[in-house]
Amino acid sequence: MSAPFETMDFAREEVAKCMACGNCQEVCPIYLETHKEGTVARGKIKLVDALLKGLVDPSTPGLEHNLHMCLTCKACVEICPCGVEIDKIVLAARAELVRKEGLHPLKKVIFNVVDHPKLMDTGMRLGGNFQGAVFKKEKETGGYTPRFPFGLDMRRVVPDLANKPFRMTVPEVNRPQGPSKYKVAFFTGCTSNYMYPNVARSFMNVMKRNNVEVIVPKKQHCCGMPVLAHGDQKTAKEMAMDHVKLFRSLAVDYILFVCGSCALSFKEHYPELLEDTNMYEDAKRVAAKVMDWSDFLLNVVKADVSGLHTARQVVTYHDPCHLRRGMGVYEEPRKILNELPDVEFREMKRPNRCCGSAGSFSLTHYDLSMDIQKNKVEDIESTGAEIVVTGCGSCIMQLTDGQKRFGGHCKIRHTVEILSDAYENAEREDRVNRMKSLTK
């Protein structure tokens, strides 16, 4: 069989597994808002089956729209009794439509920039320096909303872009002060590189505190998930090749991530994209080293954070879809939060329900994404938490927007930021105690 997104062979096999039970209706965030069969997994499978049988063609009105009414959140995959990989059926069908109908010209331009790190860095640096001219600052969130209608919804809150991308602010090799336990590569992802550099700085601090040597490869760029999600399988494949070549050359023990979607790209999609190439074995070797930072910290380093004091805070946790259902990381962030003595952790009723972001979905379907987000805001508010903690930059952006739109009062932070603050506070306490002992 060819690679899953290269032809429709994989999709054909997966479609045949579906017994049309409708269990997916219970968990699909989009269906729960629209109640339209074409938006749920079963409906999409019927559409793809019709496409495979020639009953519809790629230009059929409504086909592309329905195939893009999917967050690829994997909730349907998780509940499917037949094990149908519905998200990959959707990705394969989107790729087929692009092969037959072509890619929208604007997407071509955007994906070309995303695929070229120097162009991306230049564009994002200019954006950071001139953001105030196009966007207005929001006091409540610290983010920005558009001043003019230029493709973004005027209500959309976007983060403050860094004046200088994170990767430009650190050396490639970062050694701890003490003996190094492990040597890891850090894939920053776009959000922590350009939008939330404090997440990346916090990661570096946590690794330093645990005597982990960190390599930050300068030639890394976008993981390719947004490109693959829009059906540009060719560019996604090129991006996968770039990263496999880069990371296979590094003598590291693990490749660590602060974003579940980026990690899932390396772990799952790169071997799939490169299955029919001579880089397949290398892709599998790279994938075998992929870990979320929290998984690595607790299960490899076996760090003990129970003695780290920080500011007293009540928090809840939102599960990023690809981190929980894709990477299987669920317990580790909660264990970190529960073990910090000054953090009171309160679980939501539906912590694993998608926030409605799905990267660019919240840009192209803003109102629907906010309808989905409203449920999350209500769930958050019911906990009485002051801070919502999560493990994905895209989720941080969406949750921040939702707090503003629906009158929430929570700060949104990444788990690694909470832990980094605790390490910093512990160091301050240690300095104070040493000073006290010297003055006695």
Predicted regions and their residues:
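Glycine- and acidic
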Residues: 12-13, 29, 75, 185-189, ...
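Non-heme iron-sulfur electron-transfer modules
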Residues: 1-7, 31-62, 83-110, 408-416
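Hydrophobic alpha-helical scaffolding
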Residues: 4, 14-17, 38, 56, ...
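Cys/His-enriched microdomains
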Residues: 13-22, 26, 68-78, 221, ...
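Iron-sulfur cluster-binding electron-transfer modules in prokaryotic oxidoreductases
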Residues: 86-440
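Iron-sulfur cluster-binding cysteine motifs and their immediate structural context
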Residues: 19, 23-47, 64, 69-96, ...
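Ferredoxin-like iron-sulfur electron-transfer modules
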Residues: 1-20, 33-36, 49-72, 311, ...
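Alpha-helix capping and helix-loop boundary segments enriched in small/acidic/polar residues
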Residues: 16, 35-39, 227-234
